[in-house]
């Protein structure tokens, strides 16, 4: 039976019952959706970053240079960049639920095919296809959340969802290290081949589960009663009254603020993707030899990142201050990058500085997104954020390729880390140049 109080709650006069009913309804939606969406992102993100762990063995087996690896890791983002807009168009036509499932299933299949790589060309090809397969996944999640949450509740949900990034690092390191060490030689396969195969399986399974677990919209949710559906639909309908008209692409591309945000995001992402793909190598350089131990130790910087995300996000919201909360971690992350390479002969210090670097540059991502969303609204936000995300993610190509090329050129990590630190500091300086009144909301 339905709870009589729940039925009457939306229409009872006075704010306390209505507020209580609304909060309870959104809490119910969050319990149903957000943990599953985080699971989707964690298993999918593992397929993106496991190449960094596979590198520990596959470069030797396939005789790839550091430059080949860097280009292969980065070319993923060229496919991602080229197919993101077409993917978003298809998502609007078919619906976020179906398209997210399609992304995950095709992503898992392509990731598993990486075990067939023999040549640099094949490596580049499969990474490019992986980028095509993943394109639209993050925007798809954001779009799906807009079908349930109004803007005033959406920011918190996005921030909660993005905890999946450090969580995937915390889980991915030990799991990848375990697979590579204990499956190496099974049926004559090296550990890196088993890594690509076994970590693709959860992505495929969760992709199929998405078709059955997620609902296409509020009306299709059998786990909500009619009063809860009316509340959710009413809030979204009320919000739609204030939507602005769709801006032209020319207006978006001619807005200097959009390009300013693109540069800042690019500078954040340079360090983030460097650590994503090269963290296992940096840990190995610091003196850790066992593949399993490398996987376990790489979880430490991601633990620091998760804690930093939560603390900085709460502080920024409480103080309504955005610029310094973003600039300071970026500078700290840049310092961590430089100090980690200078302390590479001292394992404990190197891991400590890598943790500072990760906490600074990776935790900057959710903090960054509070900037453009502070002055972009409605359709302008949708178009502007798409541009910022696409341009900024090109750092995923530039960063690993630059690191690999400089490592082959100089036979060390120092030049690459200093370049990353310089870009990150320049981005932090740009953040402080943004007028406070534009973003501190």
Residue ranges and their predicted role:
Residues 51-52, 252-309, 365, 369, ...:
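Extracytoplasmic gate region of multi-pass secondary transporters
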Residues 63, 95, 116-122, 133, ...:
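Helix-breaking motifs and short loop linkers at transmembrane-helix boundaries and internal kinks
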């Amino acid at each position: 039976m339905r709870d009589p109080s729940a039925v009457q709650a939306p229409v009872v006069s006075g704010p306390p019952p209505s507020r209580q009913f609304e909060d309870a309804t959104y809490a119910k939606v969050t319990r149903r959706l957000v943990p599953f969406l985080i699971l989707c992102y964690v298993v999918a993100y593992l397929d993106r970053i496991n190449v960094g762990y596979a590198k520990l063995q596959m470069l030797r087996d396939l005789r790839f240079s550091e430059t080949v690896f860097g280009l292969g890791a980065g070319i993923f983002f060229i496919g991602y960049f080229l197919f993101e807009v077409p993917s978003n168009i298809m998502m609007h036509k078919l619906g976020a639920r179906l398209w997210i499932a399609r992304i995950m299933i095709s992503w898992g299949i392509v990731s598993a095919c990486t075990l067939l790589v023999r040549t640099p060309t094949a490596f580049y090809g499969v990474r490019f296809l992986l980028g095509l397969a993943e394109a639209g996944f993050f925007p798809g999640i954001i779009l799906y959340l807009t079908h349930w949450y109004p803007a005033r509740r959406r920011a918190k949900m996005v921030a909660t969802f993005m905890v999946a990034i450090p969580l995937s690092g915390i889980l991915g390191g030990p799991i990848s290290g375990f697979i590579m060490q204990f499956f190496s030689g099974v049926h004559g396969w090296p550990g890196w081949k088993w890594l690509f195969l076994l970590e693709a399986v959860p992505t495929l399974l969760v992709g199929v589960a998405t078709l059955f677990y997620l609902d296409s919209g509020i009306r299709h949710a059998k786990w909500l009663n009619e009063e809860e559906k009316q509340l959710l639909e009413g809030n979204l309908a009320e919000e739609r009254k204030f939507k602005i008209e769709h801006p032209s692409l020319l207006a978006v591309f001619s807005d200097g603020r959009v390009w300013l945000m693109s540069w800042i995001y690019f500078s954040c992402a340079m360090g983030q993707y460097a650590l994503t793909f090269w963290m296992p190598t940096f840990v190995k350089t610091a003196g850790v030899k066992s593949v399993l131990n490398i996987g376990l130790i790489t979880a430490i910087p991601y633990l620091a990142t998760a804690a930093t995300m939560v603390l900085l996000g709460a502080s920024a919201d409480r103080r309504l201050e955005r610029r310094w909360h973003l600039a300071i971690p970026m500078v700290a992350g840049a310092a961590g990058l430089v100090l980690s390479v200078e302390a590479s002969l001292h394992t404990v210090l190197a891991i400590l500085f890598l943790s500072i670097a990760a906490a600074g540059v990776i935790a900057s991502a959710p903090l960054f997104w509070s900037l453009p969303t502070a002055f972009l609204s409605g359709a302008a936000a949708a178009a502007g954020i798409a541009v910022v995300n696409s341009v900024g993610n090109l750092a995923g190509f530039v960063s690993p390729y630059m690191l690999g090329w400089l490592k082959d050129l100089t036979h060390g990590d120092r030049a690459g880390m200093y370049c990353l630190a310089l870009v990150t500091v320049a981005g932090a300086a740009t953040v402080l140049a943004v007028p406070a009144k534009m973003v501190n909301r």
